[in-house]
Amino acid sequence: MFTIETSRMVGRSDMIVEDGLLKGAQQPDGILDIFSLKPSTGRESAFWFYDKENPDAKICHVGITWQRGRIEVSYGTEIPYRRKGFMQEALVAFLEWFTTNTSENILWGLPSSDESTHILEKCGFKYYGPFEEDHSCSWYVYEMHRQ
């Protein structure tokens, strides 16, 4: 199990990393393929973030999946915790973990709202281009800068 800590949260995941590459892992209940609204394939995994002071309070998740030939990130925040900076805090911590613990070089995001786009941009993702299947959506890309 991997653990990530931020100033307000603890994130936990059963992701599997072998030789720097993400492998299939146990996925949290409730993760859906948002484009076809069907249960995920099992190649997905996520970090669930909980309140440090109330470990039963689930705040948000950052998910990762291999789809459309790309490693994609998805995320969501529980309603009571929205617009309080939790998602950006979790995504920044996840990106640091991802860069440190994998040898992957590119991570893709496909935001579904202005708020999601804003979070990706604040975390260093750059606009890439329109989504091939729906030109009303756009790809954003995060390139790892390793030292």
Predicted regions span which residues?
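GNAT-family acyltransferases
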Residues: M1-P80, V92-E115, K126-Q147
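Glycine-rich acyl-CoA binding loop
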Residues: R83-Q88
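Conserved active-site tyrosine of GNAT-family acetyltransferases
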Residues: L120
